[in-house]
């Protein structure tokens, strides 16, 4: 037993033996202070450079020849619903002409965003697809930033962005005047806000702990 081993070695020798084993096998704790500003700022700059490069690549793939194809100058597939409705929102004082409310299930935001592109470029392929292409490009940007923050790796974030660029569903959704890409963009942006909030609360918690205010109130520390 530990007691008999302690008696056979002697108290002092046994304690030195335990201390030696502890130093050998216990993993050293992490740093108690943040990294130097130089390395933090350098990584932040590199992260934004990589993000912007990948975003530019995404923009090229989303905007190149955006007006093609069309059905003899008219919308294709379900664009035939949303492009005219966006135009109605633009030309009808923000009101969509929807007799019988056949498509009332769709919220107006997506059609309003399509209308923005039509206001800039007219009723053509560029007009009804511009907002989708912009949302698809920004989707790549926020995915790179979210994954980089979660993985704490610029490389992993870059890989996520590249995979999203070449994803077929996202590529097509970004180049057609429909509502799917707007839903994907806003849901992903909401996730990004949650991740940022998580990191902010961790930072506040670390500050409270370092200042010794954990037990300042029976309801917990004020963050």
What are these model-derived regions, one by one?
Residues 10, 21-223:
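Membrane-integral, polyisoprenol-dependent glycosyltransferases
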């Amino acid at each position: 037993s530990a007691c008999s081993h302690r008696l056979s070695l002697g108290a002092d020798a046994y304690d030195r033996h335990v201390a030696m084993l502890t130093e050998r096998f216990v993993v050293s704790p992490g740093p108690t202070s943040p990294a130097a500003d130089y390395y933090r700022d350098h990584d932040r700059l590199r992260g934004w450079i990589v993000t912007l490069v990948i975003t530019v690549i995404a923009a090229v793939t989303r905007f190149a020849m955006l007006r093609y194809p069309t059905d003899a100058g008219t919308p294709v597939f379900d664009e035939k619903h949303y492009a005219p409705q966006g135009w109605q929102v633009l030309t009808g004082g923000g009101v969509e002409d929807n007799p019988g409310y056949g498509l009332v299930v769709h919220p107006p935001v997506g059609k309003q965003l399509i209308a923005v592109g039509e206001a800039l470029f007219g009723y053509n392929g560029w007009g009804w697809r511009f907002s989708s292409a912009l949302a698809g490009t920004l989707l790549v940007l926020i995915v790179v930033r979210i994954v980089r923050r979660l993985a704490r790796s610029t490389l992993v974030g870059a890989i996520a962005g590249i995979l999203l660029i070449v994803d077929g569903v996202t590529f097509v959704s970004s180049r057609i005047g429909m509502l799917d890409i707007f839903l994907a963009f806003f849901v992903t942006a909401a996730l990004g806000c949650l991740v940022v909030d998580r990191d902010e609360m961790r930072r506040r918690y670390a500050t409270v702990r370092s200042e010794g205010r954990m037990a300042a109130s029976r309801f917990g520390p004020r963050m």
